[in-house]
């Protein structure tokens, strides 16, 4: 078989009939499948052993040859080759068709490739293929011209004969009439009788004339049709066609069905057609030119690829291997079969019937009908339901055709090639494992035994517990005691991978060291929950076992949980204390007064009566006092410390040369805070203060920036232990009695009720309208809610557990306390409008029926939104991954001098608005500048270089830039990166997940997609209803989708295309806005601007107001409220402008939700959206005008053309939505597995596309190592050379007496804990 590692490209093309016959092992002639009595495949049927191979290994069909020794022999009795039955998965057959049929993909696809090639409308094509019309395939122009006069004379003669016949008939009838009238006259009949006879005769004579006229017209039509007859002309009238055939068959050929199409294709001159189309494109205009362009695309594709267009019409069709369309016996003797077998049977039945009819010489009309049915059955086999009603099976279910097997989530691509079920895996419910270290997980014994079964069995045999593998297997199945000891050894230092679905970002799969636990639930470390988004309300997780040494090494070094503390999206630590741990540490670091519990033994200065109280010579002494109950945990004390580094101020004051370990200093603190600082590294400056969630987070952020990962991992583990310990001892619980209700609440509400009644009265008297009443009531009750809420907040004492949980940042917010104890306030209905009756009760008091009903609107909408959001967010992630999956770091530095200018600092102004000389950080520097390399020197105002070109901007450099007052810097950006496919390490900058320069091979595209998609679920499905402001303002997830799909926004705002002064004219419902450009060029006029949408606002001196007459606007500025159209921004501001616009707009949505994502992730996606350009003038290059090409390819082709003295290509920048950009990717495998599978494959086959296998998806599909991470070529084929020490150690056993071997301080050596990445030389 073909090995995937030995090819670098995969091409798809059109198969000709000869190809299909070459693939085939024999013709399938019968529609039978298997014999119902013997259950053996029928000969020449769809499961025939002679064609597809034996059903049993090394055994022919009749049983004459059995066993492997007859390998390769073909049995002379039954004709079956003796081989493995696996060949039934790869051997193909074919069906020889009695009449050619067209391939439905090329005829029915949009656009119709057959139609474009032959210049026929799809409707006409359908009529021809399905035998509803005839088409002329060739005309003997010369013969017709030579014989035209003779033929015309014959035709005139025939017409004359018709006229003579008509005249003779008329004369006869006239004579008969005369005789009849004479007879009547003789009989003395009345006038009425005569009139009747006269009328009857007139009528008959009129019919005679009309019949003759029709005949003459018919002859004229036949003649005119014949004279103008041209190839590809369609004749719908069958009678005329038959007449033409009878009279002039020597001068033309024609036909109907796929046969006629085949004849046309065979006589089609591709080169001549391409030349004539190019001429039309050169000289033509309008629709004609457009159609020529579209046709040229198809014609040029066939010319360029060397595909034979005749492949679009099939003379024989392939039959896929039987194991891919199996038939299985069910209980009760019935069979379940793949739909394909039914579809193949229909084709074979109709084909055999057609053969029989042709042999019998059946009438043409019957044969044509049978051919049409054959065409329809082949269509159904290839793509059921594409044309007409689908073929259905039992229960009216449409049968799954070959196309359906590839399409969609259940298709071959997404179900079996991109995602496979894997062995060595298991799943179970998760529970918390607070005793675990960060790099450990608890694995249930039974699950571990099943996962590690082969390893355990091997060891049982090695250790002579079992004689052979079979008995070892039996021991494992019976769970003998010795099995557990061996299992312990097998799992030691063998990491497992845990995964929780949905895996929204790369931290959804992490590696852990397994620890065997009783029970059947997997134990998860509490700090790993954030990354997995796991909780313990019944969540399940899957376990996977890395088998090979390489896989284990990757799991340990790259995926171990303790190496993945930072978020790849923002670079912030994810393994933070949460919930109980926060409460515990908050409680530990509180400060209490001496009279409160926990504040006893506080510091008191010396008096005349005695020495100072609460002064301790060491931490040990303070702990002793605490143990005796003399000292409270939160009491302020003075304690002498020598093992912890002092705060920065104390260090500067007492130790100007720097503090050394062992030097003592006096801390004014509490015992709890000293214990907290003991958890941090000893040389980290002492942290003083109450540690709520935010201060804890900033400490861990700081640690992550300054210390190796291993130290951070150990520290957060200690924080976790201490957090749980003190949370338990704090005794924080919530009861109904802790919820305090405002005593004077009723009075307050009565007061607001009176105000509400006043508003209602005003409305009744007509003083205010409905909208004003609504707004007044909303404002009034919001004020009431805030007042009650604030009063409730002030009512709670500090030691009440409810505000304690909120203030510590463990859970909830003050708003929820208002709801619990104050009043719920205003709620919205399903349309998002406020209900003007507020909910006045709190949950503690209980809601009335009406209030409960009003409240349920919003709750239901919330639930519906959440469900929709999850699906939408998942689909967004999928599209983002698809568009960016081939963006991989390909080289260290692309050498570009370009970059993006980003703000760093803004000057601080005094009260009068004058600069003070100080600077503060610009907004969002952490997500824009941090972690990037400079593209040019960053210099202070006096010219000194603060950070040199090519240096990275880290936290220290950022601080230096701020102090020097550097307002903006030019940084390297992926959007200006010159690497052809992918990006370079320098333009990307630091990896957010490691804090170091990104490594070559990192799949930054997928990381970017995950970073944007993962918080997608948190974004709301928000559409704001701001009464009458140009409809709705889209926000949240829909806005992000709108931006990435480059859609025109609903409330679109025009943008200024020049700098200039604004003039506003006010019409009834619209504004007319004129800009007088600064450069004196013609005025730019914007007409019919909606008043409802409202003019955009200008921010001047901290005040926002709408644009006014005479204001100055800058190019690209919005003129109305709403959102700008990205396509317009591209036109006005160019590529750089639209890039910045998209990044800012996406960030705006995420920042609203408090989600931090680094700009570089969004830049990668935007870069992919702007990759393509449209060719306007192809110059001397191969490109077709109007085609979309890669920007890099266009630049390269232009350079090449100019070098050889030609003209460069002229292009226009395009912005494509992510879906369109994914489908326009170079890789057809990736595009086909994304969406519109059949369309992509049709196009790829016609163009004979080659897939260079650059991205990740295409390599996953064919089963190759992905070209990213450790799979890139420079890391392949690395073998480990053991050192002499390692060789020696391999043959010596460690002594089991040495205590140090198992001691805890050998962290990272034998404990299976994380080893800092810096210590391992990966190269």
From Swiss-Prot:
Reactions performed catalytically: RNA(n) + a ribonucleoside 5'-triphosphate = RNA(n+1) + diphosphate
Co-factor remark: Binds 1 Mg(2+) ion per subunit. Binds 2 Zn(2+) ions per subunit.
Binding residues for Zn(2+) 1: 60, 62, 75, 78
InterPro entries found in the cross-reference section: DNA-dir_RpoC_beta_prime, DNA-dir_RpoC_beta_prime_bact, RNA_pol_asu, RNA_pol_N, RNA_pol_Rpb1_1, RNA_pol_Rpb1_3, RNA_pol_Rpb1_3_sf, RNA_pol_Rpb1_4
Enzyme Commission number: 2.7.7.6
Names of the cofactor(s): Mg(2+); Zn(2+)
Family named by the database record: Belongs to the RNA polymerase beta' chain family.
Name of this protein: DNA-directed RNA polymerase subunit beta'
Cellular component, GO annotation: DNA-directed RNA polymerase complex
Pfam short name (any one): RNA_pol_Rpb1_1
Subunit structure: The RNAP catalytic core consists of 2 alpha, 1 beta, 1 beta' and 1 omega subunit. When a sigma factor is associated with the core the holoenzyme is formed, which can initiate transcription.
Gene from which this protein is expressed: rpoC
One GO term (biological process): DNA-templated transcription
UniProt GO molecular function: DNA binding; DNA-directed RNA polymerase activity; magnesium ion binding; zinc ion binding
UniProt binding sites for Mg(2+): 535, 537, 539
UniProt keywords, alphabetically: DNA-directed RNA polymerase, Magnesium, Metal-binding, Nucleotidyltransferase, Transcription, Transferase, Zinc
Species assigned in the record: Corynebacterium jeikeium (strain K411)
Keyword Transferase belongs to the record: yes
Superkingdom in the source lineage: Bacteria
Cited function: DNA-dependent RNA polymerase catalyzes the transcription of DNA into RNA using the four ribonucleoside triphosphates as substrates.
UniProt: Zn(2+) 2 binding residues: 894, 977, 984, 987
Enzyme class: transferase
